[in-house]
Amino acid sequence: MKYYLCKFVPPRADFLPTMSEKEQQWMKAHGAYLTELLDQGLIVAHGPVMDPAGGYGVSLFQIPDDQDIAALTSKDPIVLNGVGHYEHYPMLHLTSRQ
């Protein structure tokens, strides 16, 4: 297994409070996509971070060795629509509640 902390970086610091209607739709699809990966056991947890300098998203991934983290995050609807990007940080291990 491989483990990653993934940070979703929105296109602007004030993205969350200033989303257009289309961006709101894409964010809803983004949340549904991450929850689907959670249900598949590929994500351990995900959610928004309310940083005063600008909000962003964090996801903890636990994926099989033969899967590519960039391939998974590139299929996120918000990324497919050109709104923001992911940063991927490998972790040595991940311990979580069962």
Give the residues covered by each predicted segment.
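Conserved, structured core segments of small domains
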Residues: 1-98
